[in-house]
């Protein structure tokens, strides 16, 4: 979906006593838009590869990760928030961003990540294109670099946003949920995150 859930979907958390903050990812059809750097409306493909040809500073997800960090800082500064009890939660892209939030900001004490996306891009290339989620990687090489002459450079750049490379930074407790028959966010790419966690995890 690429955007925060509808508020009605979060009522179960609020009636359980949790304060809830939801983030729209820039340029992905949420209620808030980043008109300066992302087009208005929805974009489905191109987020992973965007900026990878230039360098890691131009990566789309680098900016999204900075958004996540800033969001945690804003939440922690609110007077009604106990910054020692912050958690992150999400599924797919949201699962990846929940882990990124915990990796970049040690204020996050617990994280629940359901079938997290954005991990082990090299393994994704080895598996082959079976789903829309990573299609843009294969389309890049098919149409722009069919001989894979830039593959090493692209993979090195994408390593900067690969969630598995951030996993060791997480200090809080992590719970991960996956499906072993997931052909969108492949389980083996999720294990790459799980196996690099140094904090308590299940």
Cite the ranges covered by each PLM segment.
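Hydrolase active-site cap/lid region
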Residues: 100-149
């Amino acid at each position: 979906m690429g955007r925060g859930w509808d508020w009605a979907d979060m009522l179960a958390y609020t009636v359980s006593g949790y304060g809830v903050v939801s983030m729209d990812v820039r340029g992905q059809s949420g209620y808030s838009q980043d008109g300066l750097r992302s087009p208005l409306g929805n974009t489905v493909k191109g987020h992973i590869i965007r900026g990878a040809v230039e360098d890691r500073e131009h990566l789309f997800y680098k900016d999204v990760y900075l958004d996540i960090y800033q969001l945690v800082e804003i939440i922690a500064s609110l007077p009604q928030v106990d910054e020692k009890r912050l958690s992150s939660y999400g599924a797919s892209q949201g699962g990846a961003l929940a882990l990124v939030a915990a990796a970049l900001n040690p204020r996050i004490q617990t994280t629940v990540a359901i079938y997290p996306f954005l991990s082990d891009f090299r393994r994704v290339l080895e598996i082959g294109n079976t789903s829309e989620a990573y299609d843009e990687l294969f389309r890049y090489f098919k149409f722009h670099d069919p001989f894979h002459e830039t593959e090493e450079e692209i993979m090195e750049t994408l390593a900067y946003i690969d969630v598995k490379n951030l996993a060791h930074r997480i200090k809080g407790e992590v719970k991960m949920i996956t499906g072993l028959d997931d052909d969108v966010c492949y389980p083996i790419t999720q294990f790459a995150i799980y196996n690099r966690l140094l904090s308590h995890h299940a």
